[in-house]
Amino acid sequence: MLAKRIIPCLDIKDGQTVKGTNFVNLRQAGDPVELGRTYSEQGADELVFLDITASHEGRKTFTDLVKRVAANINIPFTVGGGINELSDVDRLLNAGADKVSINSSAIRNPDLVDKIAKHFGSQVCVVAIDAKQTETGWKCYLNGGRIETDKYLFDWAKEVNNRGAGEILFTSMNHDGVKNGYANEALSTLADLLTIPVIASGGAGCMEHFRDTFAKGKADAALAASVFHFGEIKIPELKQYLCEQGINVRL
């Protein structure tokens, strides 16, 4: 069985790492280059870098910042934000990214998933899905959770799986930043539905939450931001704990 992955996420706004609760009220959380280096040294399995203003403000992800982060880490590196065409992917891979994460652009133009998978390989294409549990089910949102779409989480995840995405990064907007645990029921449904790995995002507050998302949510990887950025959970201690709980992680 593949080892479960622990993935710190850097949300970048104006060149700084920030972390909000429920997608608003952003507060600064440090220099992305320093944080990336620290996580790499601490044994994080991967790093995710999201330019959270890129899609909304039509800005291209800061290529030079990607280069600086990539130069300071030795773990797989996923970059997202404002990726709309193959040339964006090319630019970011050349800057040192290993994978790209697409979200709003995939919903607006689903063929982009097929194109990236075909041109660069499925392993490069991570489709991020921001969804919120509503009365009618899990609805997908665009532009950092600002715009509701007519797509539903499970249908959309299945579609991008079929189109050639290599992984799904699912953020529950109901759980994001609240620190009450991941959306394990929805994650477990995704795991059963899909043939590709699922990364859980939104809700980590303590080590037990990571254990539960692997055991109950059947997630392949767990992503978190604030608990790492503010030193509430240290990655070596988290991995030791998970190991003791019978979860297969890379120590």
From Swiss-Prot:
One of its GO terms (biological process) is L-histidine biosynthetic process. InterPro entries: Aldolase_TIM, His_biosynth, HisF, IGPS_HisA/HisF, RibuloseP-bd_barrel. The active site is at residues 11, 130. Its EC number is 4.3.2.10. Pathway: Amino-acid biosynthesis; L-histidine biosynthesis; L-histidine from 5-phospho-alpha-D-ribose 1-diphosphate: step 5/9. CDD domains: HisF. Gene3D superfamilies: Aldolase class I (3.20.20.70). GO terms for cellular component: cytoplasm. It is found in: Cytoplasm. It catalyses: 5-[(5-phospho-1-deoxy-D-ribulos-1-ylimino)methylamino]-1-(5-phospho-beta-D-ribosyl)imidazole-4-carboxamide + L-glutamine = D-erythro-1-(imidazol-4-yl)glycerol 3-phosphate + 5-amino-1-(5-phospho-beta-D-ribosyl)imidazole-4-carboxamide + L-glutamate + H(+). Keywords: Amino-acid biosynthesis, Cytoplasm, Histidine biosynthesis, Lyase. Pfam families: His_biosynth. GO terms for molecular function: imidazoleglycerol-phosphate synthase activity; lyase activity. Belongs to the HisA/HisF family. IGPS catalyzes the conversion of PRFAR and glutamine to IGP, AICAR and glutamate. The HisF subunit catalyzes the cyclization activity that produces IGP and AICAR from PRFAR using the ammonia provided by the HisH subunit. NCBIfam families: hisF. Heterodimer of HisH and HisF. This is Imidazole glycerol phosphate synthase subunit HisF. It comes from Phocaeicola vulgatus (strain ATCC 8482 / DSM 1447 / JCM 5826 / CCUG 4940 / NBRC 14291 / NCTC 11154) (Bacteroides vulgatus).
